[in-house]
């Protein structure tokens, strides 16, 4: 990620978290041990799989008052990778992500509820200039491990389905399908 976009991503996350004083433990996403992947239909007979290679995030876990916990993720759209350079370039173009105009997609929690095995997290997903409220069921975040020793970290996993058309991404809906299945697996290191 270039320096200015990385600064923008971190600044956006800092602003998101500064709006409310939060207690709890703060964790930064470790991109080396995390992934943001997706799949969508191809011609209704198979699936195209892809991932985003450049992202950052921050989680605040407040075990005493889980409603004060928060989750944020910023993804550099230009880092889309479907293992096909020509297709990736097309996905970055105005027909799809329009990466020059909308360089980031992001999720920022607005409400967190502790549930068995994890958290139910409502928040705003911003993609292609459109902000939409979604709810994620995050598994994990309760178990803290020290690996390597002295480095506390947590992990979360979530899957969701969004519709491209709801984010004004309507090109080739018949060929590629409207539904996009997203999986996020993230390890985060205590700050």
Q: Which ranges hold each PLM region?
A:
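C-terminal segment of classical bacterial N-terminal signal peptides
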Residues: 7-8, 15-22
């Amino acid at each position: 990620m270039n320096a200015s976009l990385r600064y923008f991503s971190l600044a956006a996350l800092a602003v998101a978290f500064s709006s409310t004083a939060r207690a709890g433990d703060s964790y930064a996403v470790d991109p080396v041990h995390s992934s943001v992947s997706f799949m969508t239909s191809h011609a209704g007979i198979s699936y195209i799989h892809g991932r985003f290679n450049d992202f950052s995030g921050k989680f605040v876990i407040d075990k005493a008052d889980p409603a004060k916990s928060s989750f944020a993720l910023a993804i550099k759209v230009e880092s889309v990778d479907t293992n096909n350079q020509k297709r990736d370039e097309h996905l970055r173009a105005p027909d799809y992500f329009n990466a020059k105009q909308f360089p980031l997609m992001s999720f920022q929690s607005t409400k967190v509820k502790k549930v068995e095995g994890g958290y139910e997290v409502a928040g705003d997903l911003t993609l292609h200039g459109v902000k939409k409220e979604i709810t994620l069921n995050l598994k994990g975040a309760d178990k803290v491990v020290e690996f390597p020793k002295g480095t506390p970290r947590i992990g979360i996993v979530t899957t969701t389905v969004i519709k491209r058309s709801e984010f004004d991404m309507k090109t080739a809906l018949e060929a590629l399908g409207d539904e996009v299945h997203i999986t996020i697996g993230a390890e985060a290191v205590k700050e």
